[in-house]
A protein has these predicted regions:
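Long recognition/docking surfaces used for binding and targeting
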Residues: 1-18
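Gly-rich Lys/Arg/Thr-decorated short loops/hinges at beta-loop-alpha junctions or inter-strand turns
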Residues: 16-19, 144-150
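Conserved S-adenosyl-L-methionine
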Residues: 24-134, 139-141, 150, 158, ...
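Short glycine-dipeptide loop
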Residues: 172-178
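Short, solvent-exposed loop/turn elements at beta->coil junctions and helix N-caps
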Residues: 212-217
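Flexible, glycine-/basic-rich loop-and-beta segments that form/coincide
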Residues: 218-235
Length: 235
């Protein structure tokens, strides 16, 4: 069976599970139409690096790969895309396995999976990236997680979504683009939220806020938005 066919079958299974609220898989799945819209706006280019710091089953990374794979026939660029361009993190071992399998069935990471089982908030990023696509988990940090205390963050907070936003802000290259799904509290919360929003507006071009319909996520009726921003800090 052709690899693309295997991959499509696997994606369909993941999507069906994502639509099943009783299975609990919905927390790992972002609707494909929303993923595609976020990729279309950020426009990743072959030769660039793409990261999802809360990658779930790898939908964003796979969509970015599909967007870039026909941009060039240059072997070096295609090898880079397949082996080095994509970076994903998730702190749940089962989900990392699902994501790795999902990408593998599309011919990505055949020698080494680009997905790491790691809480991406715990450490400063080792490298900066060109594009970030993410739908971080809503709610509080899992039981047993360490408190986030990072010198590269703008402010200390226990708000998981604000910490993910800070993490993405510090890991973008100059001129990098990000699209991230975040709940309403990120837009309206005072204190740490106000500080982070001020930094976002000062050092980045927050060009679009896309309001999502309530219930767009299969397992939760959370009011959410997509923030699209460019890194343009003065150097």
């Amino acid at each position: 069976m052709d690899g693309d066919v295997k991959g499509a079958i696997n994606e369909s299974i993941l999507e069906k599970n994502g639509q099943d609220k009783k299975s609990g898989a919905g927390q790992y799945f972002t609707p494909r139409s929303l993923i595609q819209a976020m990729v279309d706006v950020t426009r990743p280019q072959i030769g660039e690096t793409v990261c999802d710091p809360a990658c779930g089953t790898g939908g964003f990374l796979l969509a970015a790969y599909d967007y870039m794979k026909n941009q060039s026939q240059d072997k070096a660029k295609r090898d880079f895309l397949r082996d080095k361009a994509l970076h994903g993190y998730d702190n749940t071992a089962l989900v990392v396995t699902l994501a790795s399998m999902n990408l593998y069935l599309h011919g990505i990471g055949t020698d080494r999976s680009p997905i790491l089982c790691q809480d991406s908030l715990e450490k400063q990023p080792q490298t900066l990236v060109d594009v970030i696509l993410a739908n971080p988990p809503f709610g509080t940090r899992p039981a047993g997680s360490v408190d986030i205390d990072r010198p590269d963050f703008y402010v200390e907070t226990k708000n998981n979504q604000l910490n993910f936003l800070q993490h993405m802000m510090v890991m973008l290259k100059n001129g990098g683009r990000a699209a991230v799904v975040l709940p309403d509290n990120v837009l309206f919360e005072g204190g740490a939220g106000e500080t982070i929003r001020r930094e976002l507006l000062k050092n980045f071009n927050l060009h679009t806020i896309l309001r999502l319909p309530t219930g767009i996520f299969y397992a939760q009726g959370v009011k959410a938005n997509v923030l699209f921003f460019l890194e343009n800090k003065p150097y």
